[in-house]
Amino acid sequence: MATDLTWHDVLADEKQQPYFVNTLHTVAGERQSGMTVYPPQKDVFNAFRFTELGNVKVVILGQDPYHGPGQAHGLAFSVRPGIATPPSLLNMYKELETSIPGFTRPAHGYLESWARQGVLLLNTVLTVRAGQAHSHASLGWETFTDKVISLVNEHREGVVFLLWGSHAQKKGAIIDRQRHYVLRAPHPSPLSAHRGFFGCNHFVLANQWLEQHGEKPIDWMPVLPAESE
């Protein structure tokens, strides 16, 4: 079921809520005080910029942004071109190599091409202090991204949710399994990938579901913008 509603339509009220205003104020204050916060301000909402609500086919939930220099740019698991591919994403590529014929691991970790095909790459917390994982947990971002998930649940039909690890699985508890396709596995991080992420076949299952429901499957081979033009 398509929707003509945009993120702007469905999130306008949420962005007026005191908790959300406070979240933005806190993050802006840290930046102004000289702290380095990732991703850069212009990139914080890129997941919504690249994947409009009406185009969402797949949701992949991350946790909080990468906290190293130049990595985070607003898409979960993705890093900018020229930045080394992080371990969790490398493991995602390994799973793709073993499950999708012809997939060859790219030399980059930039997933904008996934986002532009309808893969919402959503971190549950949208900012982080440099070098301090989870430093912006409990600022209010979780409330906002809970709302985002509930809006996808409500306004879209037949979305594939890929929930990797207990954090994402708890976050996805509200999803209506009668209307959407929920796939669960351990997180692709090196700590847990061997406990069942490898071999989960989620990328294949997602595409099978999309095709069965009349949607174009995702091309999981990440391409840089210049390559796709």
Curated annotation (Swiss-Prot):
One of its GO terms (molecular function) is uracil DNA N-glycosylase activity. One of its GO terms (cellular component) is cytoplasm. Its main location: cytoplasm. It is found in: Cytoplasm. SMART domains: UDG (SM00986), UreE_C (SM00987). SUPFAM superfamilies: Uracil-DNA glycosylase-like. Gene3D superfamilies: Uracil-DNA glycosylase-like domain (3.40.470.10). InterPro entries: UDG_fam1, Ura-DNA_Glyclase_AS, Uracil-DNA_glycosylase-like, Uracil-DNA_glycosylase-like_sf. The active site is at D64. One of its GO terms (biological process) is base-excision repair, AP site formation via deaminated base removal. It comes from the Bacteria. Disulfide bonds: none annotated. Its EC number is 3.2.2.27. HAMAP family: UDG. PANTHER family: URACIL-DNA GLYCOSYLASE. This is Uracil-DNA glycosylase. It comes from Citrobacter koseri (strain ATCC BAA-895 / CDC 4225-83 / SGSC4696).
